[in-house]
A protein has these predicted regions:
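Conserved phosphoryl-transfer catalytic core
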Residues: 64-67
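All-alpha amphipathic helical-bundle segments outside canonical DNA-binding/catalytic cores
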Residues: 117-118, 135-151, 167-175
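Short secondary-structure transition hinges
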Residues: 88-142
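Basic, helix-initiating cap at the start of DNA-binding domains
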Residues: 1-25, 29-41, 51-58
Length: 224
């Protein structure tokens, strides 16, 4: 295996292990020793890629942000807003990296970390989608895209936190669908609202769609 590929795999292994430890113990209680044991790598290998526990936490949060990804484009930009939320819901239930990133962002005891970046980045992405929706005439006249983006991100943070505490995310699909059904009628035109798909199971379908697109791109790249 080429040295660069091996380094990438090692870094990924360390991040996955760190995500597992942070998800289980939180930032303060997690230790480098716990992460080393979970990763099965040497201390030298870990410190080659990450200089500290804080550095590891930022790596997990950055990976979580990338895993949120960008949903496939839709003619209706309001649907893209919904798809972004539903995709995050699916990944929270299925991906330990996403769960760990969210736990770190919500961890009030992790005072050493800049926890606001995750929320701000998601809010910026939501604002761009809502700006596009406004340009297409999909939004009600009173809607300010940046304000609505902050509302969606903040409300979702609370809903997912409650779901994690109450059911370990098993009811997150339902809670997310309820949230969207209450928010969207106050955001989009009635003619747009009737076209939106808010089904809880849509997140899994979006994830499968993204995976299929990625596989097609890889095949195209391999045959080029």
């Amino acid at each position: 295996m080429p040295k660069q590929d091996r380094a990438i795999r090692t870094r990924r292994t360390i991040l996955v292990a760190a995500a597992s430890v942070f998800e289980e113990h939180g930032f303060q209680a997690a230790t480098i020793t716990d992460i080393l044991n979970a990763a099965g790598v040497t201390k030298g290998a870990l410190y080659f890629h990450f200089q500290s526990k804080e550095d590891l936490a930022y790596g997990v949060m950055a990976a979580q942000g990338r895993h949120m990804g960008v949903v496939p484009p839709r003619a209706c930009k309001a649907q893209e807003v919904i798809d972004t939320v539903l995709l995050q819901t699916y990944r929270l239930q299925k991906d330990p990296m996403v769960r760990a990133g969210v736990r770190l962002a919500m961890d009030q005891h992790a005072s050493e970390l800049d926890r606001g970046t995750s929320f701000q980045d998601w809010g910026k992405g939501m604002t761009l989608l809502l700006d596009a929706a406004k340009e297409q005439g999909e939004l009600l006249p009173h809607v300010v895209p940046s304000d609505t983006a902050d509302l969606v991100v903040g409300a979702y943070a609370g809903v997912q936190s409650m779901s994690q505490a109450v059911s370990g995310y098993t009811d997150l699909n339902h809670r997310t669908s309820v949230l969207l059904r209450h928010i969207m009628p106050n955001v989009v035109q009635s003619s747009v609202l009737t076209t939106l798909d808010l089904a809880p199971e849509r997140g899994a379908a979006i994830y499968a769609e993204i995976q299929a697109l990625m596989e097609a791109e890889e095949l195209a790249g391999a045959s080029a």
